[in-house]
Amino acid sequence: MVSTHVDIEQAEWTPGIPFYGPAARYDGKDIVQLKVLSDRRAEGGGIAWLAKFSPPRGKLIKIVATALSDEHVFNLEGGRATKSGAPARASGGYTLNPTGQPHSAMIAAETVSLIIYSGEPDQIVSMEVIDVAA
């Protein structure tokens, strides 16, 4: 097997719809975009990507999912938020959602995360854009 190398700066952001569903586009804009770094699922491995979440001004992205394999999330920029849009976790944080774990995220500011799955990516139960609570 050969090593995989990806020039992150040269890799293009692609729509997140194939993995996150049609709600990854809002008012004609891709609010979830991915740079797939590796996909070894066909060989029994996992998939890794950079994900960029870009909620519209005054809104937040709410995601509810179930981990179909161990999911490692490293927040590189931005982070999770409360319903009021206040930061709950800043960049530099790490989360492990083990296989079978239901979990959720609310994102109120542009966020970039490195997400690594040991197998299949999350099953997205729901994803919606909601108003930031006053």
Question: Over which residues does each language-model region extend?
Answer:
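Short conserved catalytic/interaction loops centered on acidic-Pro-aromatic/His motifs
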Residues: S84-S91, M106-I107
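Ligand-binding loop in jelly-roll beta-barrel domains
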Residues: T99-S126
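Structural motif
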Residues: G46-A48, V73, E110-V112
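Conserved short histidine dyad/triad with adjacent acidic residue
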Residues: D30-A67, A86-A88, P98-P102
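Alpha/beta-hydrolase fold active-site loops
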Residues: D70
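Short beta-strand segments in beta-sandwich/barrel cores
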Residues: G58-L60, V73, G78-T82, Y94, ...
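Residue-level recognition of well-ordered beta-strand positions that form the cores
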Residues: L50-K52, G79, I116
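A short, N-terminal "cap"/entry segment at the start of jelly-roll beta-barrel domains
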Residues: M1-I47, V129-A134
